Regions:
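Helix-loop-helix hairpin linking two adjacent transmembrane segments in secondary transporters
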Residues: 138-190
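Conserved MFS/SLC helix-loop-helix module at the cytosolic interface between two early adjacent transmembrane helices
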Residues: 61-100
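Extracytoplasmic
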Residues: 11-45, 49, 62-66, 150-151
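Cytosolic juxtamembrane N-terminal segment immediately preceding the first transmembrane helix
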Residues: 1-19, 23, 206, 210-214
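Small-residue-rich segments within alpha-helical transmembrane domains of MFS-like 12-TM solute carriers
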Residues: 24, 28, 110-118, 144-148
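Hydrophobic core of transmembrane alpha-helices in multi-pass small-molecule transporters
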Residues: 21, 89, 100-115
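Flexible cytoplasmic inter-helical loops of multi-pass small-molecule transporters
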Residues: 186-211
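Intracellular juxtamembrane helix-capping segments at the cytosolic ends
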Residues: 115-128, 136
Length: 214
């Protein structure tokens, strides 16, 4: 049975895109709440940006580490692990009383968030051959959908309850959306299909090299 570019491949892409849209908010949340934490902790803008800086450091490190975990344990277990890390981080962030503790927590949130970017993109790419380019582009856009969709949803919570409740909403969304969706990604591509994919990738690389030489 054909696995590449199949109906299931597109279904899997849709699920992965939903996971990415929820999972990647860990990168954007601190940007959304930045004015509020600046005001509450009475700090300047440069100090208030420390949580975002450490989020990106955690995100960069997490892409490599989470990628290795995917290689060993599969995408479902990796997403569940990342969801647990982020949920604990969100709940802990609700309790902090200074920007430095928040920054440390955002490092771990960024680390967990990484599972919803590079590793998820790589896993999705295995299910496509002819349409791999558009599939990778679509799943990568989950990061930006996250940054576009969630901020407007948080406006009322920020105005009425404050930034801590935003973290509470994210903790609930991560547990009740990401984890259930991850179980729909448990199926692994067959070794035969994987070999076909690897052979096609190798041929593309050789063609590119020959083109450069010519």
């Amino acid at each position: 049975m054909k696995e590449h570019d199949s109906l299931y491949s597109w279904f899997r892409l849709l699920i992965a895109l939903l996971v990415a849209t929820v999972g990647n908010i860990g990168m954007w949340v601190v940007v959304i709440i930045l004015p509020d934490i600046q005001q509450e902790f009475t700090i300047d803008r440069s100090t208030a940006s420390i949580p975002f800086a450490l989020t990106m450091v955690g995100f960069a490190i997490g892409n490599g580490v989470m990628g290795r975990i995917v290689d060993h344990y599969g995408i479902t277990k990796t997403i569940i692990l990342a969801a647990i890390i982020n949920t604990v981080g969100y709940i802990a962030a609700m309790q902090v009383n200074n920007v430095y503790l928040l920054s440390i927590l955002q490092f771990f949130i960024g680390f967990g968030t990484a599972a919803s970017f590079g590793p998820l993109i790589a896993d999705t790419s295995h299910w496509f051959l002819k349409r791999r380019g558009i599939a990778v582009a679509l799943i990568a856009s989950g990061n930006y959908f996250s940054g576009a969709i969630w901020p407007p949803l948080f406006n009322s919570a920020l105005q009425s309850d404050g930034w801590r409740d935003v973290y509470g909403i994210l903790a609930l969304a991560t547990i009740f959306i990401m984890i259930p969706l991850s179980f729909l990604l448990t199926k692994k591509i067959s070794e035969e299909t994987s070999r076909v994919s690897d052979a096609a990738s190798l041929k593309t690389q050789k063609d590119l090299l020959m083109g450069k030489r010519n």
